[in-house]
Regions:
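Short, surface-exposed amphipathic charged segments that create phosphate/polyanion-binding patches used
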Residues: 45-52, 114-119, 183-185
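Short, acidic, metal-binding catalytic loop of nucleotide-sugar glycosyltransferases
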Residues: 21-29
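Hydrophobic targeting segments
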Residues: 2-5, 22
Length: 227
């Protein structure tokens, strides 16, 4: 299983705990960071620095098929995820008729700001791109131009026809602070997404599921997984 996680220098601990949470439930998972400085050095990314981007991986996530040599399936997720079930269950949902599969959220942010005081920009299909199961060999990705397309075109999957964009269960991109009121009585999250900021930020240290994240953090330290 090939897994890429967006890396931001301000969220080092979030990345490490996300990585640990994946491998806790699936020890043979291959987890790699997408670091903007590295993909620039590789010549894969040459966009100007976007001062409005909330994270360093805002657009580099769409390099996942290229980083995977356009072979097989890859999972991308933001670093503010905490996996509490085996990610293999997610890969088992991969359907080759789709170019990519996502949780198709329908929600509006509660605030104009998000993690670390960043501006919250509303747009269609918001948060769909925070977790993507990529079919790297699908012909649609020939039209994916990470350096040339606008941020809106990328985050709204404009290079993929609607019929080629599959849907994943909401449990795998559980928006912390949003979905408990809607779904908690009938569904249990499989992967928590601290989309407005997690316990690693002072201003959101007491968010929902903060104790669970800290539990994984302590386990991560004990297992010498954080460097």
């Amino acid at each position: 299983m090939n897994i890429w996680v967006g890396y931001d220098t301000r969220e080092h601990w979030a990345f490490k705990v996300c990585d640990y949470s994946i491998r806790k439930h699936r020890p043979d998972a291959i987890v790699k960071p997408i670091e903007q400085r590295n993909v620039r050095l590789l010549g894969l990314y040459d966009r100007p620095v976007d001062e409005n981007a909330s994270t360093e991986f805002s657009l580099t996530r769409f390099l996942t098929p290229a980083l995977s040599n356009f072979k097989g399936w890859s999972l991308y997720c933001d670093c503010d995820f905490l996996f509490i079930e085996d990610v293999k269950d997610l890969f088992d949902m991969a359907d080759p008729k789709y170019a990519a599969m996502v949780v198709k959220h329908d929600y509006k942010p509660k605030s104009n700001t998000k993690m670390d005081g960043q501006i919250q920009f509303p747009y269609p299909r918001k948060n769909w791109s925070s977790l993507i199961l990529f079919n790297n060999e699908h012909p649609s990705h020939k039209f994916l131009d990470v350096n040339g397309m606008t941020p809106a075109e990328l985050h709204q999957f404009d290079w993929i026809a609607d019929k080629d964009l599959g849907e994943l269960p909401v449990e795998w991109n559980w928006l912390v602070g949003y979905y408990d009121d809607l779904w908690r009585t009938v569904l249990d999250p499989s992967a928590l997404h601290y989309t407005d900021g997690g316990p690693w930020f002072e201003e959101t240290k007491d968010c929902d599921y903060s104790d669970l994240w800290r539990q994984y953090y302590e386990e991560c330290l004990d297992a010498n997984k954080v460097f």
